Amino acid sequence: MAEAEGSSLLLLPPPPPPPRMAEVEAPTAAETDMKQYQGSGGVAMDVERSRFPYCVVWTPIPVLTWFFPIIGHMGICTSTGVIRDFAGPYFVSEDNMAFGKPAKYWKLDPAQVYASGPNAWDTAVHDASEEYKHRMHNLCCDNCHSHVALALNLMRYNNSTNWNMVTLCFFCLLYGKYVSVGAFVKTWLPFILLLGIILTVSLVFNLR
């Protein structure tokens, strides 16, 4: 009897290994990119849906940008990424940027807003947009850049009330990031082609 019990114990299968902790999966490239685009306050940037929280956004204007690549159409986004842009006389667009989706964005820091009151960023964007609903659009003097400048002045971004179209154009050129390679090509290729044509024609006439 003892031998039978000993034999049965020897025939029992080995116990299963103890459960291990679940392995942590490495983040995918898309997840890594999304973390890089993560906005302040936990609101994520979404290029496909044109959501750029706390950003100034820019897109090329057909023909005009072909000759002057640093000149384009500008808007400013709310804390949730909704774009507001002065799109024409007495009209400020919401979530439907004139001239197409943004090609470039300039990420700002909401901690640099010095205006008092709750939700100062969105309040400034709203007040600037309401003001420009009563203004005539002027390409040279009072345009989309001026609308964005007013919003930044109202919120006292970087503790300044001296924002204007020139400073915005410069900082957007310096700190702006293209949303994709295609956006970069869309902005600069027409200018490069036109420049090439002008140089070629000039060279041909000089060689005659």
Curated annotation (Swiss-Prot):
Keyword Transmembrane among UniProt keywords: yes
Transmembrane annotation, as ranges: 56-76, 165-185, 187-207
Record topological domains on the Cytoplasmic side: 77-164, 208
InterPro entries in UniProt: TMEM222/RTE1
Residue numbers on the Extracellular membrane side: 1-55, 186
PANTHER family attached to this UniProt entry: TRANSMEMBRANE PROTEIN 222
Name of this chain's protein: Transmembrane protein 222
